[in-house]
Design a protein with these regions (language model features):
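Acyl-donor (CoA/ACP) binding surface of acyl/acetyltransferases
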Residues: 1-14, 28-29, 36-144
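Short, positively charged
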Residues: 17-25
Length: 144
């Protein structure tokens, strides 16, 4: 479910305590980088429950887009993150098959790195992120 540009347009999410922090972050993010669907933030829903969130960190720049995702705590370790990541990849490739898809993680093995590996991302190595410091950068390698 797309997260829209303003709080007023996101009333359904604004009343959900699970969305408080991420909704504000997305709206603030749009103010910095712009609102350019489909390269926006999303909530993932299953059976009427919010199960996670997903985002593109802005529209592609130099034909490269970075993805980000998270799983609600009550839905972790059930494949939700893997499915969310897959949907971001599919949306990217459907929108622009030539786009290079990347992701960044903390520089250690984790559930997030495993999710990327399951979705055909390969570790490129260390990069310095302006917000997060030293991180691992990953790139999607196989077309769906």
């Amino acid at each position: 479910m797309p997260i829209k540009q303003t709080l007023e347009e996101n009333k359904a999410f604004a009343s959900n305590p699970l969305c408080n922090e991420s909704l504000s972050m997305c709206i603030d993010f749009y103010k910095r980088v712009g609102f350019d669907p489909p390269w926006i933030c999303y909530y993932a829903e299953e059976g009427g429950d919010l199960i996670g969130n997903a985002a593109f960190k802005g529209r592609p720049i130099n034909n490269t887009v970075e993805i980000s995702y998270g799983t609600m705590e009550s839905h972790r370790q059930h494949g939700v993150g893997t499915r969310i990541c897959k949907q971001l990849v599919e949306l990217s490739l459907t929108t622009d098959p030539s786009v290079r898809i990347t992701a960044r993680t903390l520089p250690e093995k984790s559930y997030s790195t495993r999710i990327l590996e399951k979705n055909n991302f390969v570790l490129l190595g260390f990069v310095t992120d302006p917000e997060d410091g030293d991180v691992w950068e990953w790139e999607y390698k196989n077309k769906i």
